[in-house]
């Protein structure tokens, strides 16, 4: 596995080549992973997933879900990729599920707590590596003490998280050498330290001294950390890392945050954000065509997530019994709203996804208010494809030296919604 960079300004444009046991797969950078739940894309079968364009070659498994299958996979002996029916997919196993809450205060010097549907599991380095031996992933995040995202982490606690994580890393590296089933697997070192710059830098420098295949920037999930602090820490950490190894970040998915992290040297992101949007009954409609094309500008206005045509105050608002999720972002539309019941446009004008080519907003509104399972399937197909296409647009913008233009477009939509964002001439 090796990073080949093209030297574009504003981000690390290139390719992560030599992936998988065969070494034939490659991931374009900056890029994202395919988010899965127990090895399956949410709401989708393998057949419906094949209808989605731009699916990344690397799928993300989460350890809490896979740990429950440990005994089954250990008996199966052929690894999770073949077990889930995706033998040609490169698998990355992360320590936590980015969507699931992770209670604080349960890690110790010897164990890290995972939270699954069956409750809390305590994970030692030895038990962790036993599970990885059964999963046989191509990449996996090393066990680490990432309990530093509450916003109230002291310098002492940040230091402890780094010390514990380095201790876990050394133990797992020793076990990796003695595990023949994982000789083709790559371990990613986890960089911790909360919001304490000195500890973040120490974690990055010490982790970079170990024989890891890449780096995982952890602890930047959620809103506990101020945005300016978060971005300054990411810049400082990536400056300490070798150029020839990939950098993954967990818990960052919104388009504006993704662009800021890319500018600061991050390579790979998760794709949990489209899943969260789908679970809210929403569709991604933000524009990412940064070229000065009048047709693109017109389509962007037409696809506005914050339509000015809101229900007027005179209308009976009691009919609007379903309220939007408070976590909803300006990049999406809430299709349960009554105004979509007779909106016969596709979710996104110009979108080539399976859903937009065949169905309308009105039909999705009907499926959602009727609690039909098909709603999740169609929304997931659209949201995944739109999100994957966004990363393709980022790479094009880097290649064309237009990242600033794309960033302006995305940031205007973050503030105003797609309808009111204008594309600079």
Curated annotation (Swiss-Prot):
Gene3D superfamilies reported for this sequence: Queuine tRNA-ribosyltransferase-like
GO cellular component terms, semicolon-separated: cytoplasm; mitochondrial outer membrane; mitochondrion
Chain spans, region Disordered: 302-323
Keyword entries, A-Z: Cytoplasm, Membrane, Metal-binding, Mitochondrion, Mitochondrion outer membrane, tRNA processing, Zinc
InterPro entries listed in its UniProt record: QTRTD1, Queuine_tRNA-ribosyltrfase, TGT-like_sf, tRNA_ribo_trans-like
Bilayer topology: Peripheral membrane protein
Summary of the function given for this chain in its UniProt record: Non-catalytic subunit of the queuine tRNA-ribosyltransferase (TGT) that catalyzes the base-exchange of a guanine (G) residue with queuine (Q) at position 34 (anticodon wobble position) in tRNAs with GU(N) anticodons (tRNA-Asp, -Asn, -His and -Tyr), resulting in the hypermodified nucleoside queuosine (7-(((4,5-cis-dihydroxy-2-cyclopenten-1-yl)amino)methyl)-7-deazaguanosine).
Subunit structure: Heterodimer of a catalytic subunit QTRT1 and an accessory subunit QTRT2.
Protein name: Queuine tRNA-ribosyltransferase accessory subunit 2
Source taxonomy: Eukaryota, Metazoa, Chordata, Craniata, Vertebrata
Gene: QTRT2
